Amino acid sequence: MSIDINWEAATSGPDGEALAERIRSFIHDKFQQIALPRFIRSVEVNSFDFGTIKPELQIKDLCDPFEDFYEEDEDNEIGDGEVSDIQDRSPKPRPSSAGNERSAADAWQAEHPAFLDDRLCGRIEPHDVPIPSKEDPLASRPIRSPMSFGDPLNPYFFPRAGTPGIPGGTSNLGYYYMPLGGISGTQTPLSSVPRGPFSPGLRDASVFGEPSNSQRPNPSGPARRQSEIDIDTGNSRPSTADTLDSLNIHGIPDPVLPRSSDDAHPNVLPRRDNSPAPRRVREKRPEDLQVLCRLRYNGNIRLSLTALVLLDYPMPNFVGLPLKLNITGLTFDGVAVVAYIRKRVHFCFLSPEDADTLFGADDTNEAGHLQSRDSLAGGINDTSYSSRRPHDSLLRDVRVESEIGRKEDGKQVLKNVGKVEKFVLEQVRRIFEEEFVYPSFWTFLV
């Protein structure tokens, strides 16, 4: 189905002039953001005109709008009647009953290294130090010296590797924590040295043997113990994950380190609350409509630009010559997408690859082989830049006129600057494809 467009009514009058000025200002701003080559100082867009030739539209399909058209931009204002249409498609955060504790802990972490695990960073609630009773077997446990390495049944007692100049070596396997010691420097806290044999709540295997029947049996206990012995015989620092696993072998919770739900996965760092903002998606309605139509244009649209070209003779940046470029027409053939969702109209073009996927390859290359118009006289060059392959760009053919310097006896001082023309036309194509080709699209309020 073809559509007849009243091109003159749409592009003339105050509304048409305002639209043309907005397009000129938009292209000019885009050129100010482009890194110019060394031989061009600046590029200015002077004017834009729609021309008198109208495009041809042919409707190809009516379907549901693309999913991207339902996403709500954070910068867009939402009316009172549209608030209920916004849906949140992100996972809901888990409720927390300790908001003040979390904020205090996050403030503490901001002043400390972030690579440490939360369980070993000192996030410990105030508590009373338990005093062992006479009936507690832990109270009668013998105190071992850091130099006592003779117990063959305890996998923690291994001699430290010798280092020249440092008595006893540098391995941290010989440092043990005494709960009531409190001497700084000679003992290392449990939070920084894992697998200390005198950690609170950790039973010594050489004294008490296997766990009692009241504790939950762990079938993987003996295999785990053997693997720990094989791993700990090296001189490397023991793994932090093995520390927490060894506490669970005997089924005894640690009274110093608070347990959390993240302890079930000791190798996974705790999740931070820095997830990206949720996507706001509008609710779909039956009246939403999208039109896919083929747009062909071979018209006399005009765009006037001025580029200041630098001359390096007889010295660098000796003089700048204004190069005036006039785009006098172009040939376009592509698939346009117009989606109507309530009070918004979304507009874009499909890339040639996407268009071929939807409708098949184009068997007629009429737009790519149209002849350019006759050249204008008076010392103005007319150059036609066509794509070598039909699908390189939606802009199949761009006709440009170049004029540089002043005229003497009807002739230009410099008749053609091919590099400047090529650069400007490549940027015009790039701006069009980046701003108008899907997934980029424009939204209009109606």
Swiss-Prot record:
Stored CDD domains: SMP_Mdm12
Ranges annotated as biased composition (Acidic residues): 75-85
An MF annotation (GO) of this entry: lipid binding
Domain SMP-LTD: 1-446
Disulfide bonds, paired cysteine numbers: none
Basic and acidic residues: compositionally biased ranges: 126-138, 260-274
Domain of life: Eukaryota
Function comment: Component of the ERMES/MDM complex, which serves as a molecular tether to connect the endoplasmic reticulum (ER) and mitochondria. Components of this complex are involved in the control of mitochondrial shape and protein biogenesis, and function in nonvesicular lipid trafficking between the ER and mitochondria. MDM12 is required for the interaction of the ER-resident membrane protein MMM1 and the outer mitochondrial membrane-resident beta-barrel protein MDM10.
Full protein name: Mitochondrial distribution and morphology protein 12
